[in-house]
UniProtKB/Swiss-Prot annotation:
Name listed for the protein in its UniProt record: Large ribosomal subunit protein eL42
Subunit structure: Component of the large ribosomal subunit.
This protein's record includes keyword Cytoplasm: yes
Function of the molecule: Component of the large ribosomal subunit. The ribosome is a large ribonucleoprotein complex responsible for the synthesis of proteins in the cell.
The organism's taxonomic lineage, starting at the top: Eukaryota, Metazoa, Chordata, Craniata, Vertebrata
Organism expressing this protein natively: Oryctolagus cuniculus (Rabbit)
Entry keyword Ligase: no
Length: 111
């Protein structure tokens, strides 16, 4: 499981220095009905003759790459940028940090 904090101090290109950034997970927007490929597809599909293009069924990957959206918290800046991280099955944003478990019968003290 990947746990990412909700804020991160990192370089802002617009400010030109390290600033705190608000971290959110990128989500794909709604597909446009007026993109050239969609217009062509809809035109081809209309009328008689069933499905005209192959429907993709051989999915290879079980995970997606996680993309973080970093937004500068400076009120005058608010610039946004994307940061891709590795693939993972479980992604968590701002979850609880792992704590070291301390048992009473251990000789060394826990730090």
């Amino acid at each position: 499981m990947v746990n990412v904090p909700k804020t991160r101090r990192t370089f802002c290109k617009k400010c030109g220095k390290h600033q705190p950034h608000k971290v959110t997970q990128y989500k794909k927007g709604k597909d446009s009905l007026y993109a050239q490929g969609k217009r062509r597809y809809d035109r081809k599909q209309s009328g008689y003759g069933g499905q005209t293009k192959p429907i993709f069924r051989k999915k290879a990957k079980t995970t997606k790459k996680i993309v973080l959206r970093l937004e500068c918290v400076e009120p005058n800046c608010r610039s946004k940028r994307m940061l891709a991280i590795k693939r993972c099955k479980h992604f968590e944003l701002g979850g609880d940090k792992k704590r070291k478990v301390c048992y009473a019968w251990k000789v060394q003290p826990c730090l």
